[in-house]
Every structure is written in structure tokens, then in C-alpha cells.
């Protein structure tokens, strides 16, 4: 049996990107939720290259009296998961909770995650109840969840919800992974011995708009497919074999029909030829695009550039910058 260590200090990691309207409420509610734990805590807010006043507000929050806010300023926008990894590299707690800054996942759920982690779980995921998102967002999320479940074999219900708790050894394991395309909930489940999901409330977004546009969701889908499995490459080989066999069969059939009915049959086969040709060309472009995605990610990994560049860290204990 593995010894279950009680949680002594909680670190809350929150990526921030142009969230100046929600920041005061976010900090207030998150601080209140952490105070109710009766444990040591810290709140790490990572500014992911915001163009509004978010970074300045984070610095002020860290420098306030009796603050528990650690502000991490990144030089530009690297994306949600890279920003969270930047936060992971500066945590000091033995339980790390991730949370979005838009307040759609209430910070008041934090004590429930801590209590569940205290039961001995390595990862505590969440499932959003009565999601307050658009039909498009909910449909895209369902498709992504099904893709992940089939690829990884992990029957988690809501990979898109970032309100999650991770034991310190899980976070340390993730920090030792150096691939550029990182999807944290999946990566954490690879290392977790015991994982569980609990239902949580989901609220409407009060401030601003979602940072996940249509194209960002498409990029996320490509990231998930190419960083999880090489199955699409195997499927391309299978598809190529099927197309080759089909093309040969059609060619034989066309020869037989031409010999049987003469050259006038089906406009001398011109239309059929074009149909087959366009089918093959379309399949080739799909395959080339998918191969390009894999090769592009290999190229990115080979360059070994950092996932992010932390420009400044402001801790509450001192106003000096790291």
C-alpha cells in the first residue's frame, strides 16, 4: 500500500490573458476560497502576454499587504497550457490546482478538490454541470473528449475543464517532459496511478469573450491528434492501400467496359476518369497535410526552443523581481 500524505500547502495556478475586468473578482473569490481551507496557500497568476492592463494589476496584487499572490509575467502570448507550465515551474505547494481566469469555473469549488485529493488521489478532474457555453463550443468539446478517450483509453468525461488538482509528483513529472505541444490533463493522466472526476458548477462568462476562437479550436484538435498517437499515419497507409486497390479495380473495369461496349461508352470514359482522378488528388492532399503536421511538430521539437520565456516574477514576500 502507498502511504497517503495529507495536503499541507495548496498552490493555485491561473493563466491570465486580457482579463482585466474579471481580475479583481477572481482574486477576491480565489483568496476567500483558499482562506477557508485552513492550510498554507499561494495563488500564482501568469500573465500570458496580455495587451490590456492585466499585467499591471497582477503586480499591484502581489505587492499588496498580506498578499498571497505570485505574479509571473511572460514576454508574449504562448497559449493557455504553456502559461500553466510556467506556473508549475514556480509552485511551492504539494497540491497544485489549475483554474481559468474567466470565473466560469467557480473558485468556491477549490475546497472540494482539496478534500478529494486528501483521500489519496493523484489527479482530481472535474465535469462541468449544465455548461453555459454556446452550442458550437459544447459540440466541439464533446468531439475532442471522444477523440481523447478513444486514443488514450482513459475514460475521463471532461478533458476541457481546467479546474483540476494535481499532486506535486505529477507536476514534477510533467515538467520533465519537453515536447512543445502539451495538453496538461492528458499528460497528467499518463503519470497518475489514481485519478477521479467530480461534478462542478459552471457559470456564464461575465466579462469579455472566450479566447478560444474557431481557428484556435482547430489548432487544438490538430495538437491533440498529433501529440497523442501515430494512428493517423497508420490510417494513411491503410487508406493509400485501399485507394490503390480501388484504382486498379476501376482501371480493369473500365478496360472491360470499353472492350464490351466500345469507345462511345460513358463519353469514352472521360467523366469517370476525372471522378477517379479528383478522388485520388483529394486523398493525397489530406495525407500530405497530416504528414506536414507531424513533420512540423518534429521540427519544432528538434529546435528545442523553450515553451515560454518568463520575463519577471513578483512574490509577495519581497518586491524585488526574480
UniProtKB/Swiss-Prot annotation:
Query: Which residue windows are transmembrane per the record?
Result: 236-256, 270-290
Q: How does it sit in the membrane?
A: Multi-pass membrane protein
Q: Which UniProt keywords apply?
A: Antibiotic resistance, Cell inner membrane, Cell membrane, Glycosyltransferase, Lipid A biosynthesis, Lipid biosynthesis, Lipid metabolism, Lipopolysaccharide biosynthesis, Membrane, Transferase, Transmembrane, Transmembrane helix
The record's catalysed reaction(s) read: UDP-4-deoxy-4-formamido-beta-L-arabinose + di-trans,octa-cis-undecaprenyl phosphate = 4-deoxy-4-formamido-alpha-L-arabinopyranosyl di-trans,octa-cis-undecaprenyl phosphate + UDP
Q: Where in the cell is it found?
A: Cell inner membrane
Enzyme class at the top of the EC tree: transferase
GO annotations of cellular component type: plasma membrane
Report the Gene3D superfamilies cross-referenced here.
Answer: Spore Coat Polysaccharide Biosynthesis Protein SpsA, Chain A
| Family matches, as CDD domains | DPM1_like_bac
Q: Which GO terms describe its molecular function?
A: phosphotransferase activity, for other substituted phosphate groups; undecaprenyl-phosphate 4-deoxy-4-formamido-L-arabinose transferase activity
Record-linked HAMAP family: ArnC_transfer
Matches recorded under NCBIfam families: PRK10714.1 (NF007986)
Functional summary from the UniProt entry? Catalyzes the transfer of 4-deoxy-4-formamido-L-arabinose from UDP to undecaprenyl phosphate. The modified arabinose is attached to lipid A and is required for resistance to polymyxin and cationic antimicrobial peptides.
What's the protein name? Undecaprenyl-phosphate 4-deoxy-4-formamido-L-arabinose transferase
- Organism, by scientific name, is Shigella flexneri
Amino acid at each position: 500500500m502507498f502511504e497517503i500524505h495529507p495536503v499541507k500547502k495548496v498552490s493555485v495556478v491561473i493563466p491570465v490573458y486580457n482579463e482585466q475586468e474579471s481580475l479583481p473578482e477572481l482574486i477576491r473569490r480565489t483568496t476567500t476560497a483558499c482562506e477557508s481551507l485552513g492550510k498554507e496557500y499561494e495563488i500564482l497568476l501568469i500573465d500570458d502576454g496580455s495587451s490590456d492592463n492585466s499585467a499591471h494589476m497582477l503586480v499591484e496584487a502581489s505587492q499588496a499587504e498580506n498578499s498571497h499572490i505570485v505574479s509571473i509575467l511572460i514576454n508574449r502570448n504562448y497559449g493557455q497550457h504553456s502559461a500553466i507550465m510556467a506556473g508549475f515551474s514556480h509552485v511551492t505547494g504539494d497540491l497544485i490546482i489549475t483554474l481559468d481566469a474567466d470565473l466560469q469555473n467557480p473558485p468556491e469549488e477549490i475546497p472540494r478538490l482539496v478534500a478529494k485529493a486528501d483521500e489519496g488521489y493523484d489527479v482530481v478532474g472535474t465535469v462541468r454541470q449544465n455548461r453555459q457555453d454556446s452550442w458550437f463550443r459544447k459540440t466541439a468539446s464533446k468531439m475532442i473528449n471522444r477523440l481523447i478517450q478513444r486514443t488514450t483509453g482513459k475514460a475521463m468525461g471532461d478533458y476541457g475543464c481546467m479546474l483540476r488538482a494535481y499532486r506535486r509528483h505529477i507536476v514534477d513529472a510533467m515538467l520533465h517532459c519537453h515536447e512543445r505541444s502539451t495538453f496538461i490533463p492528458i499528460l497528467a493522466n499518463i503519470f497518475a496511478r489514481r485519478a477521479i472526476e467530480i461534478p462542478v458548477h459552471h457559470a456564464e462568462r461575465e466579462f469579455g469573450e472566450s479566447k478560444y476562437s474557431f481557428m484556435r479550436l482547430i489548432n487544438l484538435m490538430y495538437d491533440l491528434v498529433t501529440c497523442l498517437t501515430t494512428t493517423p499515419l497508420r490510417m494513411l497507409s491503410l487508406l493509400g492501400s485501399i485507394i490503390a486497390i480501388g484504382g486498379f479495380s476501376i482501371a480493369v473495369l473500365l478496360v472491360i467496359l470499353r472492350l464490351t461496349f466500345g469507345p462511345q461508352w460513358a463519353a469514352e470514359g472521360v467523366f469517370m476518369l476525372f471522378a477517379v482522378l479528383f478522388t485520388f488528388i483529394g486523398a493525397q492532399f489530406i495525407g500530405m497535410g497530416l504528414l506536414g503536421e507531424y513533420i512540423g511538430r518534429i521540427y519544432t521539437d528538434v529546435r528545442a526552443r523553450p515553451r515560454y520565456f518568463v520575463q519577471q516574477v513578483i512574490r509577495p514576500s519581497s518586491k524585488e523581481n526574480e
